[in-house]
Amino acid sequence: MSVVSNTSFEHALREGANALGLDLSEAQITQLLDFLALLQKWNKVYNLTAVRDPQEMLTHHLLDSLAAVPPLRRHVAQRGQDSAARPGARLLDVGSGGGLPGVVFAICCPEVDVSCVDTVAKKAAFIQQAAGTLGLSNLHGIHARVETLAGPFDVVSCRAFAALADFTAWSRQALAPHGVWLAMKGKHPHDEIAALPADVSVFHVEQLTVPGLQAERCILWLRPVA
């Protein structure tokens, strides 16, 4: 598979991963490039993303998603220190579309079981196809509305999906006890935070720097309040 997996893309990916402080194996680099190739190949058929240019796909999608991997890895590692927690973690990526960031999480965090849910059948089918092609047994595509999923998932993530109040309300029943939400946003969403109900708490906000992307990015970590 070599639609975009040429030397220049590999170099840009390696440089981006280094800038993010990400330690990736050769197999993971190959899987990420192959995923990018799949995304470009099937985008015309499935309409997975409005971004058509391969270079923009690398920056706006792949590196943007990779920026969230170090925070996720830290959370999973901290969770693993809890003797009561089961090994690894189950993650639900809501409104995953073409698998961003869900597929990237599955590649870079093999100890995490990732389910990507989307209401569009062909997008969920693409995730299943990507799982098979890339050899990711920890990746699953689900065609459903998130409100219908029971979980339990230790982390429920989204990227440019919906307002925080809607995201947390629609996915709350899928969250495991002591589970958390991970929301990827652009600018700090002060208004969205102010609109959250009293039983949802933002406990951490991380500013992200995406290599090659001159735009504000942040991650919000949220949890239910008893």
UniProtKB/Swiss-Prot annotation:
Taxonomic superkingdom: Bacteria
One Pfam family cited in the UniProt record for this chain: GidB
Sequence positions that bind S-adenosyl-L-methionine: G95, L100, V146, E147, R159
EC nos: 2.1.1.170
Matching SUPFAM superfamilies: S-adenosyl-L-methionine-dependent methyltransferases
GO molecular function, one term: rRNA (guanine-N7-)-methyltransferase activity
Subcellular location: Cytoplasm
EC class of the enzyme, as a word: transferase
InterPro entries: rRNA_ssu_MeTfrase_G (IPR003682), SAM-dependent_MTases_sf (IPR029063)
Reactions catalysed, as given in the entry: guanosine(527) in 16S rRNA + S-adenosyl-L-methionine = N(7)-methylguanosine(527) in 16S rRNA + S-adenosyl-L-homocysteine
Keywords per UniProt: Cytoplasm, Methyltransferase, rRNA processing, S-adenosyl-L-methionine, Transferase
One GO CC term, this protein: cytosol
Function: Specifically methylates the N7 position of guanine in position 527 of 16S rRNA.
NCBIfam families in the cross-refs: rsmG_gidB
Protein family: Belongs to the methyltransferase superfamily. RNA methyltransferase RsmG family.
Protein name per UniProt: Ribosomal RNA small subunit methyltransferase G
Species classification: Bacteria, Pseudomonadati, Pseudomonadota, Betaproteobacteria, Burkholderiales
